[in-house]
């Protein structure tokens, strides 16, 4: 058997030839480096190398493709195919930091929403009086929020898709953060101009191409009005240019592009309403005289009140933090209740809504023992408080559910109670006008009819009576009492 001549360059060149295009000029430097290494290895003394010996590389090169092109590291970070076939993409340090700070971003956003979700006078006093106890606490929270937010983006708002926040919990957190940014800017705690607020409104309040609700459209129009008043006060641009920027003639086209619809598709009912109202508002602003009196017709305080009303109606769903199914199961077993995993995931806001509602609107967790104390408290908060207090006294027995009956979600219960408060009693058709199909405020109750509203309201009233608590004024006119039931 003849001896094999030792020529390391053949092995290196052979392996290199498997993965590298010989005509590639970008790898010329790598070839030269390997050639020098081959020449150095060829100078090894023959007596130090055993016959038939292979080069002791220390690892197996077979099946491994070399890729030292400039896009190698980019491919690694983007999770594409790259050398060594790693099973998972390698995240950048910045991405790891953003992921680890998601809980912090969510907690700070919840605190800001809870403070700015208070009545307008109370929230304004906190923001404008940094020397007060609450003002100092809010200032510290805002400072921490700015530092954490800058880790995610230097823009005014956080775009989750642009920074790789793709999981449901991450997107939910960035949505709450954007809402906190918007409200802080409205109250003057963050320096963001009306232009950016107007441009990002739909992304903040109706993200991920979701349908715009009627109350969101009202806020959208009022924001444009306040932006116009502010721009006219600065007197830097002609009135017509400002109106055309805020109320463009191609709003219908923009709505379709926003939700990736075809240009020949029809607008939704709410989108048509928004365009009609914005067109009328634009004409009124253009013909209004004197312009200085606009502040009296469209006061800033009214806009703040509408923002606060939106928070009141949507805070629990916006700031609900997803809870793992296993932790929900453990808590359910402790209370003697049994749920399926799908049920636990479908209503994550129920677990922490009592705490967040109390935090947002300053409602104490003590028992309400008199009707005078409940006059200024919404039925939603009262219902949550009583349910929270009675959860610890529930028996292990649970009524068997009817298979074909659709259980009420927390959002539906809140909409029903809010509707009872707004229409001042059991006016079921009016409640459906607010929350039913094409509702003026939302479509939470679009799958409910008047009979279902009546039955649910009756059960809610009985719930208060059986708990020994004062029935809210909105439920007092609902049929049902303990003597008959």
Curated annotation (Swiss-Prot):
Q: Which cysteines are joined by disulfide bonds?
A: none
Gene Ontology BP annotations: telomere maintenance; telomere maintenance via telomere lengthening
Q: A Pfam family matched by this chain, by name?
A: Myb_DNA-binding
Q: Effect of knocking it out?
A: Cells arrest in interphase and have an aberrant chromatin structure.
Bias (Basic and acidic residues) ranges: 1-20
Q: What does this protein do?
A: Binds the telomeric double-stranded TTACAGG repeat and regulates telomere length.
Q: What name does UniProt use for this protein?
A: Telomeric DNA-binding factor trf1
| Gene, per the UniProt record | trf1
